[in-house]
A protein has these predicted regions:
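Alpha-helical transmembrane segments in inner-membrane proteins
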Residues: 1-327
Length: 327
């Protein structure tokens, strides 16, 4: 317990520091003390204060919300399919969410406030299809089959998304940076709607944590302990869909955060989901803040999409983990 408390305090302190440093980084550097003044004593006549509050604060909120949502979604996904390689981007949830948003935009049905609902529905439907296909055959649903079906269907759905973008130039121009996983150009309307979806996912995740802990012992053991396996998995899927939908609607399909974060927390603290889930939210938010800072400063004055940085780090980690699993 002491170790858990210490790790939690350290990560919260790092996150607090990140929240102060992050708004100061950009084309115009603003000192941390000015950032604090803007937060605590906002002056509408001060140019730096306006830059921080009106332009950079929404981006900070987007990074925190997206990182926390992806971190918790990854932890839930790994728990429900019992596979440490489980990740929303790899298993197709992000691809399904992106296809739903892009298709709606191409048909003229998209509106920013409704984007989280579209993304959640698309991600949930594709992941449900993955689970159904993975359940086929004598061996039933296994972690390996889920991963393979997820990778295959993710590639298939991504190709459909690419085809829509090639055929519809207007949608391509509107979605190009969003599809790369970008935190720029955020607005409070979309963030506010997405926050409700994230909150619903977080509440469900915390409620399901004890049942998911018992599910790790095996379906039969969990049933013997009074856990409804089907209900737990169904509500976990709903929580994952809400979290991924919120994250994708804000920043596009950012990958590998959900893979890295639960691994870090497990190694440092515990696999107990009652501890893992809240810490995954904290570490996910911190990780995405760091990734976005690097993306914005690595090739100044140019900016990379945040999703590019997470993929550059996450893809090699995924390959290493997969290699160790197959040994």
């Amino acid at each position: 317990m002491m170790r858990t408390g210490l790790v939690t305090v350290i990560f919260l302190a790092l996150l607090l520091v990140g929240c102060v440093v992050y708004p100061g980084i950009g084309a115009r550097f603003i000192a941390p003390q000015t950032v604090l003044q803007a937060f605590l004593h906002f002056d509408p006549q001060n140019f730096d204060h306006n830059v921080i509050v009106r332009l950079r604060l929404p981006r900070l909120a987007a990074a925190l919300l997206t990182g926390a949502s992806l971190g918790v979604a990854g932890a839930l996904l790994q728990a429900v399919i019992r596979n440490p390689l489980g990740e929303p981007h790899i298993l197709g949830l992000n691809a399904g969410a992106a296809l739903a948003v892009v298709a709606a935009s191409a048909l003229g049905l998209a509106f920013p406030v409704g984007r989280p609902l579209l993304a959640s529905t698309g991600g949930a439907l594709l992941f449900l299809l993955i689970l159904l296909l993975s359940s086929a055959g004598r061996s039933g649903l296994t972690p390996m089959k889920v991963t393979l079906c997820g990778v295959a269907l993710s590639a298939f759905v991504s190709s459909i998304t690419a085809a829509i973008l090639i055929l519809d130039e207007q949608t391509l121009l509107a979605m190009r940076t969003w599809l790369a996983g970008d935190l720029a150009g955020q607005d409070w309307a979309t963030l506010g709607t997405s926050a409700w979806f994230s909150l619903g996912g977080f509440v469900l995740a915390i409620y399901l944590a004890p049942s998911l802990n018992m599910l790790a012992l095996g379906d039969r053991m969990a049933q013997g302990l009074g856990v409804s396996v089907l209900r737990t998995r169904t509500f976990t899927l709903l929580a994952i869909a809400l979290l991924c939908g919120a994250a994708v609607s804000i920043a596009g399909p950012i990958g590998f955060v959900g893979l890295l974060v639960p691994q870090i927390v497990r190694r440092l603290v515990s696999a107990d989901l009652r501890v893992l889930l809240p810490l995954s939210a904290c570490v996910g938010a911190l990780l995405l803040l760091l990734a976005d800072i690097i993306a914005r400063t690595l090739f100044t004055p140019y900016e990379l999409a945040t999703g590019v940085m997470t993929a550059l780090v996450g893809a090699p980690v995924f390959v290493i983990m997969a290699t160790r699993m197959f040994k």
